[in-house]
Design a protein with these regions (language model features):
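Charged, glycine-rich intrinsically disordered N-terminal tails and low-complexity linkers that flank
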Residues: 1-74, 78, 137-140
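Short, contiguous clusters of charged residues that form electrostatic/catalytic patches at enzyme active sites
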Residues: 50, 78-81, 148-151
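Short, well-structured hydrophobic secondary-structure segments
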Residues: 63, 67-95, 104
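Nucleic-acid nuclease catalytic cores
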Residues: 86-109, 113-175
């Protein structure tokens, strides 16, 4: 069953608590390879142990918030505002879970669109936005670094499509 936590604010204590011990779309790349095979490496094992520890203790250790993360939090607001003005009305949601497989996977989309769409925003450093605009946009491809997260988000929400928004202040937005 899909559960929407619409009032939850991403990054809040409530949001961290809801994600505690759950596999989420943003972390799926740690257990699935870009070729969609199950990972079997130190990162995968470390992540599974981290989730296990969270389930046992009901505690999520604090994470370092660096300059890139701070920029991302600010850029996400700007990107969503620009997206809404350019493309479509958006509805914000904090967290979505789906447990139809006998276990729960979580996803924090940046916005939902109507009944069938969602938006995932990425704040990019200028050099990566330049790469996105020159390598991926002309051929209508998604940066491989984000494919697993977008696909998992669609799996969790059971929606039909996702606009991946790549944003860097001062440069064109890519969708």
């Amino acid at each position: 069953m899909i559960t929407y936590h619409k009032e939850m604010v991403q990054g809040s204590e409530e949001w961290l608590s809801a994600r505690c011990g759950l596999l989420t779309a943003s972390e799926m790349h740690l257990i699935v390879t870009p070729t969609l095979k199950a990972a079997s490496n130190e990162k995968e094992r470390a992540h599974l142990y981290e989730l296990l520890a969270q389930r046992i203790t009901s505690y999520v250790p604090p994470r370092y918030v660096g300059d890139d993360m701070l920029r991302g939090m600010e850029d996400e607001v700007l990107a969503l505002d620009l997206y809404a003005k350019t493309y479509s009305k958006i509805d914000r949601v904090g967290f979505i879970t789906n447990d139809k497989w006998g276990f729960t996977i979580g996803y924090s989309p940046d916005a939902l669109i109507g009944d069938n769409g969602q938006v995932e925003c990425k704040s990019r450093a200028p050099k990566y936005q330049a790469q996105t605009l020159t390598e991926f946009v002309p051929v209508k491809k998604i940066d491989p670094d984000f494919v697993i997260q977008v696909q998992t988000g669609l799996l969790v929400t059971e929606r039909d499509w996702c606009d991946l928004v790549s944003y860097c202040g001062g440069m064109p937005m890519a969708t």
